[in-house]
C-alpha cells in the first residue's frame, strides 16, 4: 500500500486528537464539518482507507463507532517475497505485496514472508498455502527450519549437518532428504520463526 496522503493523515490525526481530548470518537458528520466535506460518502472513503491501513476499527451501527488500533493490535507489515517449496525447490519470485503478522512473531533483525507450496513440512505444521515468517540471516543451527537457495531455487526444510555434509530434511516421512552436493550453489536465506494460516493482506 502507498503511504497516507496529507489529507488522510489530517483526518486520522483529527480522529485521534478528538478521542484523546473528548474520550470518544467524532461522528461522521463532525468529521465532514471539520474538513468541509460535502457528503458523508467522502468521510466513509477516508475511514475505509484508514481501516485498511490497520489504523482504525469501525462499527457502522454506532454513531461514534470508531476506535484506534494500537501498534500491537496492528501487527507488523512484512514484505511477501514470493513462493517457497515445501516439496522440491522452486524459484522465489518477488511479489509486490505485504502481509500483516502478529508482532510477537517478529523479534530483532530483518524479516520477510514466503508462501509455502507443497506438503513436505506437514510434520512441522507447515502445509500447502501457509505463509512462513522468516528472519533473514546467512547462518543457522543444526535442526532449525530454514529457507535456503539451492541452485538458485528456494526451499524450506530442516537443516542437518553431518560432519562436512549438509542435508535439507523434510518433515514428511514419505519424502527423502536433499543432499547438498555443491556448497557453492547453496545459501541460507533465513530461519523460519512463525507460520500464518489465516493472514491479513495489507
Swiss-Prot record:
It is an enzyme of class 3 (hydrolase). The record marks 86-87 as: Cleavage. It comes from the Bacteria. The keyword Iron does not apply. Pfam families: LexA_DNA_bind, Peptidase_S24. SUPFAM superfamilies: LexA/Signal peptidase, Winged helix' DNA-binding domain. CDD domains: S24_LexA-like. It catalyses: Hydrolysis of Ala-|-Gly bond in repressor LexA. HAMAP family: LexA. Homodimer. Represses a number of genes involved in the response to DNA damage (SOS response), including recA and lexA. In the presence of single-stranded DNA, RecA interacts with LexA causing an autocatalytic cleavage which disrupts the DNA-binding part of LexA, leading to derepression of the SOS regulon and eventually DNA repair. Belongs to the peptidase S24 family. This is LexA repressor.
Amino acid at each position: 500500500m502507498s503511504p497516507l496522503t496529507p489529507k488522510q493523515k489530517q483526518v486520522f490525526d483529527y480522529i485521534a486528537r478528538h478521542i484523546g481530548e473528548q474520550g470518544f470518537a467524532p461522528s461522521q458528520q463532525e468529521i465532514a464539518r471539520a474538513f468541509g466535506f460535502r457528503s458523508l460518502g467522502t468521510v466513509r472513503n477516508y475511514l475505509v482507507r484508514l481501516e485498511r491501513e490497520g489504523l482504525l476499527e469501525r462499527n457502522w451501527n454506532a454513531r461514534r463507532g470508531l476506535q484506534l488500533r494500537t501498534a500491537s493490535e496492528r501487527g507488523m507489515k512484512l514484505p511477501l517475497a514470493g513462493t517457497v517449496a515445501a516439496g522440491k525447490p522452486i524459484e522465489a519470485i518477488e511479489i509486490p505485496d505485504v502481509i500483516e503478522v502478529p508482532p510477537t512473531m517478529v523479534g530483532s533483525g530483518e524479516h520477510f514472508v514466503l508462501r509455502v507450496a507443497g506438503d513436505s513440512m506437514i510434520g512441522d505444521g507447515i502445509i500447502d498455502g501457509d505463509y512462513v515468517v522468516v528472519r533473514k540471516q546467512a547462518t543457522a543451527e543444526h535442526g532449525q527450519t530454514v529457507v535456503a537457495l539451492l541452485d538458485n531455487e528456494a526451499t524450506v526444510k530442516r537443516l542437518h549437518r553431518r560432519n562436512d555434509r549438509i542435508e535439507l530434511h523434510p518433515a514428511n516421512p514419505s519424502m527423502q532428504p536433499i543432499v547438498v552436493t555443491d556448497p557453492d550453489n547453496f545459501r541460507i536465506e533465513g530461519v523460519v520463526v512463525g507460520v500464518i494460516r489465516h493472514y491479513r493482506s495489507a
